[in-house]
Design a protein with these regions (language model features):
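Hydrophobic pocket-lining residues within nucleotide cofactor-binding pockets
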Residues: 27, 39, 127, 180
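Cytochrome P450 core scaffold surrounding the K-helix E-X-X-R motif
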Residues: 31-36
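A short glycine-rich beta-alpha junction/loop motif
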Residues: 77-85, 115-141
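Short, solvent-exposed loop/turn positions at domain surfaces
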Residues: 45-46, 116, 162
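A short beta-sheet element
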Residues: 23-24, 40-105, 123-124
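Amphipathic alpha-helical coiled-coil/heptad-repeat segments
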Residues: 129-198
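Low-complexity, Lys/Gly-biased intrinsically disordered segments
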Residues: 1-29, 45-47, 123
Length: 198
């Protein structure tokens, strides 16, 4: 990837009618279908940027320890900046399988990046040389389907837990409001100290 000169905004950067340009901050370890920054055709001609196809697996190579190793799966044609490594799966690899497999490496890449220098990073070579186990395509698809189902299940449980937390907060707030406004008499609920005989 590459970064068009930001001093030439009009020549290289545009609105949503341009070419999506992926930066490390766009990577959320999920399918990427939208970005915040778009570049022009002129940017493609004048820089190392090139448009990558949907199904490209992307990995953040630098940007600090919270960013190194973050990844995404392109769901749209897009260009990437120089801090992102794009991996184009071959015909023997299902893109989503490779995407999920690459996620496994993030903790290892982060450890290596932290020991590399003051500003943590990993090299494109290190990403490209990551050993990827390739089961038959049928098994790759089965693994991806299993992960999708488990992810959907996890998302549903997470949403249910969030609703429960919100309901408990509402009830707590209502209870406090009722106690403060006198709608609930709490005088008999707290034991009173015995009067000391004089």
């Amino acid at each position: 990837g590459g970064t068009p000169n930001t001093a030439q905004q009009e020549a290289y950067y545009t609105d949503e009618t341009g070419i999506p340009w992926v930066r490390t901050m766009d990577l959320t370890n999920e399918l990427l279908t939208s970005v915040e920054v778009y570049i022009t055709e002129q940017a493609l001609q004048d820089t190392a940027c090139k448009v990558l196809p949907p199904g490209t697996v992307m990995v953040a190579m630098y940007g600090g320890d919270g960013t190194v190793g973050k990844n995404g799966l392109l769901g749209i044609p897009a260009a990437i900046n120089q801090a992102v490594c794009g991996l184009l799966p071959s015909d023997s690899v299902f893109p989503e399988f490779m995407f999920r497999f690459i996620q496994f490496f993030r903790p290892f890449w982060m450890v290596g990046a932290e020991s590399s220098r003051k500003d943590p990073n990993i090299s494109q070579e290190r990403v490209r040389n990551a050993p990827v186990l390739l089961p038959p395509m049928e098994e790759q698809l089965a693994i991806v389907e299993f992960l999708r189902l488990q992810s959907d299940r996890f998302d549903a449980l997470s949403a249910e837990a969030q609703r429960a937390v919100e309901l408990l907060r509402e009830r707590r707030s209502a209870l406090i409001s009722a106690a403060v406004t006198g709608k609930i008499d709490v005088r008999g609920l707290v034991p009173q100290p015995e009067a000391v005989a004089a």
